[in-house]
Amino acid sequence: RCEKCNAPAEYLYLNDGKKANQVLCKICGHLGTTERVRRQSQAKYFCPHCSKPLSQWKTSSTETIYKCMSNDCPHYLKKKSALTPEEQVKRKQQKFDPNYKLHYQYREYHLKPEDLKCHRPACKTKVDLSKIHNSYHIVGLVLTFFVNAGLSSRLTRDLLKGIFGIKLSHQTVINYVNAAAAQIAPFLDCNLPKPGKIAAADETYLIVENEWHYTWFVIDSVTKAICGYNLSDTRGVAPALATLYNAYGTPDSNKGKQFTLVRDGCPSYDSAMMAYNHGLPEPVISGQKVIGLENLDEVSKEYRPHKQLVERLNRSYKFHTRPRAGMKSLNGASALTTLFVAYYNYLRVHSGMKHTPLKLEKLQGISSYPKQWETLLAISAA
């Protein structure tokens, strides 16, 4: 019978003459082999290249990796033949070197919905902006110096006193920033735009409590707006997948659509896209990899401009994080990142477009930075 449409044998005929290795179905046109591998194994998954059963190789809390162990697999032979002479010598010295990954692998993820939540500022803060003794204008001034100008809390305190005669402690500045971020975050998540056909993703470094952490961004290539963001302590699959969910929404909501994600060589993006597309009739997100600073292939040449967008976004983000010389808590880093995204999308005029990536009607005609923050806080609280 036909492997694809299950048509009886009388509808199959030899398609390669005397070799008698290939049959063609008259009903659906499917090409099959006369001696196909019968899947009598009780294995959970099979190799798509050689049809041999996949063996469970590694298991972690988030995923199980299955591996094709066959040395006759076409995928393995193709990867092996592509090795350079130097790589072949090194591999003979260490056959099980994990850097080559010649055998086909499949990952089964065990992620729960709570694992796919992006990190956001804590809802409970030390102050309630509706009950503070200072005016909202002072809060707007604090956010202008702290976010727009990228100054530290202590320098913000000093400038408020030296220029306007406003006496605040640096802790009060931090409290206002955290409270504003907690108030803006829900509004921001509800109004993040969905990426268009082409978007770029990247992760950048951030020091929190003297340890490396990572900020993830997804930016649309047309509007230049940030469509998704996240913070994590690893560059693993879970935060990458959570960022994709934050930007694109659930996979079921995108059935029948096609998106292209331009990213670097971080393997977490490949795994995250595979997990996102799992269970869908057709893949929703396909990736284009741009590595290094030079265009060494046609893909890099075509998609380099899109990758440059997220690189420039990271540079703008670093302008705001570098004066802090590291953050004392992940919640503080999340608060700063949330306010940066709000500033980048709604308040910062993009030099190439001569306007902000996203527009809010209530912000139109307001040129004063403190007043813009006051208005944005009022919109978020509504």
Predicted regions and their residues:
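C-terminal domain-tail junction helix/linker
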Residues: 323-382
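Short, positively charged, Gly/Tyr-enriched micro-motifs
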Residues: 4, 28-198, 203-209
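Short, flexible loop/turn motifs enriched in small residues
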Residues: 208-214, 221, 225
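Active-site beta-loop-alpha junctions of metal-dependent nucleic acid enzymes
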Residues: 178-179, 229-254
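Active-site proximal helix-loop segment of RNase H-like, two-metal nucleases, encompassing DDE(D)
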Residues: 298-302, 306-329
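Acidic/histidine-rich, metal-coordinating catalytic segments
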Residues: 255-270, 291, 359
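RNase H-like polynucleotidyl transferase catalytic core
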Residues: 280-308
